[in-house]
Amino acid sequence: MRLSRPAIRRLLGSLLTILLLGTLGVGLARSLSHVPLSSFAPQSTAVSAQSGELLRLTLAADGQYRLWVDLERMPSRLPAAVLLYEDRWFYLHPGVNPVALARAMFEAGVGRRRVGASTITMQLARRMYRLNTRDPRGKLRQMALALWLEARYSKHDILEAYLNLAPYGRNVEGVGAASLVYFATPAAHLSVPQVMTLAVIPQNPRERRLRSGDANSRKLADGLEEARARLWARWVKAVPDDARFSAAVAAPISARPPEQLPFAAPHFTDALLRSAAGEVQSTLDLARQRTVERILTKYIEGESQLGIRNAGALLLEVGGGVATVRAYVGSADYRDARIDGQVNAVTAKRSPGSALKPFIYGLALDQGLLHPRTILKDAPTAFGPFSPENFDGRFMGPIAAEDALIRSRNVPAVAVASQLSRPTLYEFLQVGGVSRLKSERHYGLALALGGGEVSMEELGRLYALLLNGGRLPAIRSILSQEPMTGGVRLLSEESSFIVLDMLSKNPRPDTGAPASPAVAWKTGTSWGFHDAWSVAVFGRYVLLVWIGNFDNTGNPAFVGVQAAAPLLFRIIDALRAQGLAAGDLVRRFPASVARIEVCAASGDLPNPACPQTVSTWYIPGKSPIRLSTLHRYVYFDAANHRVCGPGPEVRQEVYEFWTSDMLRLFREAGMPRRTPPADPDCGNGSEPGGSDSEALHIVSPLRGLVYTERALHPAPLALRADVGAATHAVYWFAGNAFIGRAPAGETLPWLPQQSGRYTLRAVDDRGGADTRELEVELVP
């Protein structure tokens, strides 16, 4: 179309007016504050692995892939190539190139081929303000806005904004997004052929689409290659040294379409996207992530006949006071709606079952309640209205603390938890970052067995403190996060070390022997078989595995040691086989921890009568250590009558002096212990030993607890005392009121009639006595 001379004159007049006003407005515009050009369009978020490999690129709010990249982070050839191809006079014109504009008008006036006159700034104005530049008014507005932009922003900012908003085909805008979408690399790492390719696409993004493999794209790809060849010819003339790249530029270039963008570690990226934006380089190790995903998927497929359909896993690397996320699997299949696959097992609140027991023992170590070989009682016990049972329904009698932990015995754990104070287990969890806890009274001692809920991330952080010397580490999932040091101390270094040592003796489920290299691990099974857990500390890593259903459907197969532990060790073995988690358990050796020989049967310092000793860790000045009184010498004359001491023709034998309830447990287990013949003149045995274990001790109700009962349907309180083997009966009193008589080692039920404080007194038939203060609260 040819323009008439009057039309040309009017257009030139308008252009001169725009140029004049633009020049006059420069001073004013420069003095005004302005918003960054990066804020004119919504941005995508790119989440990458620690290696820089893209995990996920989100769409911006307007449905475009757009990722802002500073000009300094682009290869220097890219802006230079774009200016060479699009706007050689960019640094000289004020936003509108009068020479190019006049030439374009002349060519249009004489009816020749249309010649572009848009500068980089004009193209930026069109992109920013969505202008229709096909009609003269739109074109005039574009030029006015270009002058305005030049007046307000530097050439650096304008060029940077153009490269971040330029069209690259489909819904891809800007160099940052185009480099990730098409070439799977950050803009800073673009090769010379890739730079030359991206430099020519914005001029005609429809005709110069990157080859994506579809049958109709060949012609479009040819148009792109021709444009790139023209640019390269100009480039080599301008930069002769780059002629060495000519073969690479001439070679076919491969690119992926947006449909093939990665969608890796979806639960992990979902979690990051809630708080992060822009370019986010995470701490995720893609090799470890893929290994964990592969093993987990294969395990679920193999166990599907048991109804095991879903699982999650979290791998943390502990060091420098932080727990760094290395692998993160929120479900067996993110896209499977049948298992609610988009629910995140790492952040979901679930019952941990017995997985909190190591911290009960850790607190007890710090509070001087036990050492690993302290003998605990695994026997029927009522803690007020709470009467825990073991998973197998059986009781083992006397058991060492470390064995009770490894075998996950419930009654000893609850008994130890009942003795904790400042902090209690509840206070430990509260300070340890477990969120949404109800009141301590709501849980009571059931918290020790999984009565509360934790997330996998929260539980992993607690186990990570065992590797961090007892200090609670921060969870780190973004590489740029400043490492936090000096986290709150929840356990001592000594306690953390000993707990890991105890857990490392837990035998693998497949071999029946402790793992080598060492793995300190624990399982958990929630009530109703809703959750199966397994947690391991190995090398400098913490690995957590959960199996269950998000709809809370129970399954008898959901047992920690049977369902979760095999998956746990398959992952550990695979990581070690690939060299991704090699090495023995990394533990700090506190100088104040020592080894000591104790009597194997009692856990106390061995007296001369103790037949067998074992070595254990203890914390000097804190661990309870006393001389054992379990084994004692008993003397017999030639006629096999008991005598009270050594003498001519007197032999000595060693007897174990267990309390009455323990003797009963041994009998019920089919392992009765022999008891020495009674002789009132000889007391309870001869030194070494003494008679402490023969004294009467009230063991139920517990000291310091408030017993709350329903007034209409109260449950009887269990009254029980430990007595010596020679005791036959125990008599119970509430104040001066007689309650009843119980055989030695047996429980007497008692129903208080009103709320208040009671003084309970137990007296045995040999004169032994003990008292216990008790508070009872009857509620409607």
Which role fits each region the language model picked out?
Residues 91-100, 173-176, 339-342, 365-383, ...:
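Short, well-structured active-site flanking segments
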Residues 81-83, 87, 235, 292, ...:
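Active-site SXXK
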Residues 7, 245-261, 519-780:
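Soluble, non-transmembrane domains of envelope/secretory-pathway proteins that act on or interact
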Residues 282-305, 313-317, 328-331, 336-345, ...:
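A penicillin-recognizing enzyme superfamily signal
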Residues 1-50:
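N-terminal type II signal-anchor transmembrane helix
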Residues 25-26, 113, 117-294, 329, ...:
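Non-catalytic, structured segments within soluble enzyme domains
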Residues 44-57, 74, 306-338, 432, ...:
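A short, well-structured edge-of-sheet supersecondary motif
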Residues 107-134, 261-274, 370-425, 468, ...:
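Conserved catalytic neighborhood of penicillin-recognizing serine enzymes
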